[in-house]
């Protein structure tokens, strides 16, 4: 249904700002990184790039820029960047980021990401880049945090450069 809606609106985000967190959750859960990235790249109304092209420094209340231009309360799109592109997701069975899933979803055309997420234990860092058809990942976990790491199937080589790696 979302794909059909995006097609109907010529690839644009087809929800209001209140619907963005719902869309974002669906995209992350269904690993539809290209779907979201294609919508984010649309330069005209309605969309985030439209806001940026019109000098926005915060999320607007309405896609067209009417009314408040400082309306961060519905900025659910940020979740997509650190949960999908960065790949940092909390394990709902172990609240408080005691255990996290590291599983980057790499949209076509994106070649790197530097992602941090503050947790009660400290900063979780996932930096990755594509180089020569190889995915290079750097993951830093604070003491007290465990992670399950999943590498996208397109990139199957793994090389450990840190003190320990348990697979």
Across the structure, where does each feature detected by a protein language model lie?
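Conserved small/polar residues in nucleotide/adenosyl-binding loops
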Residues: 1-2, 156-163
